[in-house]
A protein has these predicted regions:
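Fe(II)/2-oxoglutarate oxygenase catalytic core
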Residues: 1-114, 121-124, 160-170, 189-190, ...
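A generic structural signal for short, solvent-exposed coil/turn residues
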Residues: 39, 105, 133, 147-149, ...
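Conserved hydrophobic/aromatic beta-strand scaffold that supports enzyme active sites
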Residues: 46, 140-142, 176-178
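Low-complexity, flexible helical/coil segments
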Residues: 148-151, 176-180, 191-194
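Short amphipathic alpha-helical leader/targeting segments
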Residues: 155, 188-189
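Conserved small/polar residues in nucleotide/adenosyl-binding loops
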Residues: 200-202
Length: 202
């Protein structure tokens, strides 16, 4: 079935230098006061990608309607912005260029970036509390940025909300899955710690 997915699913990988540059910033993500804020640590920024450059638009509020997000729909969520050195890094520019080229985005396209780390604070921690879902965009990218002391967290993709997943994979360091969010649904398996009382995150 994957031969029918050329335009809806693309798999690639960041350069080793981009991963090495970006990965340390994921250890400095803040908790939030939102419903998932104790285990989904996050920064969020909206940028414009123009002439190959990342331009910070200083937008840090995010909302999804409840028909898209059954967990936190119709809630305006304010997040701390992605730190300037990270946002202006060559690694972030590489991500945006990759995303723009793969999806044939117009020059100057706005791109919303969620920088997130998920900690296994429960026996089983839900990576995606909303379950099988879409995010409300035409295109999205999921990028693996490191795993420590966890199992689970497999990305699962679906052709429709009620079908079994046709794709399942743990995204390893720097691996990128780009998908047509308006055509596919996604979810992830829960994560759990391998060694208790040790630092855990994905």
């Amino acid at each position: 079935m994957l031969h029918n997915r050329e335009t809806t699913l693309q798999l690639t990988k960041l350069s080793d230098s981009a991963f090495a540059q970006l990965a340390p910033s994921f250890t400095k993500l803040p908790n939030t006061e939102h419903a998932d804020g104790k285990f989904r640590l996050r920064r969020y920024s909206v940028i414009q990608f123009k002439d190959g450059q990342v331009i910070d638009l200083q937008k840090n509020e995010f909302m999804q309607t409840d028909d898209i997000n059954r967990f936190q729909g119709n809630v305006v969520r304010q997040f701390e912005p992605i730190e300037t050195p990270t946002l202006q890094s060559e690694g972030m520019r590489e991500i945006c260029q990759l995303f723009a080229d793969a999806n044939k985005l117009a020059d100057g396209q706005e791109i919303e970036i969620h920088q997130m780390r998920i900690s296994a604070i429960f026996d089983e921690t839900q990576v995606a509390p909303e379950g099988v879902h879409q995010d409300g965009f035409e295109h999205i990218a999921l990028i693996g940025m490191g795993r420590h002391n966890i199992e689970g967290g497999d990305v699962m993709l679906y052709s429709s909300f009620n079908e079994a997943p046709f794709f399942r994979k743990v995204l390893q360091n720097g691996e990128v899955a780009m998908l047509a969010d308006n055509k596919l649904w996604h979810n992830a398996t829960p994560i759990r710690s391998v060694i208790e009382l040790s630092l855990i995150h994905i």
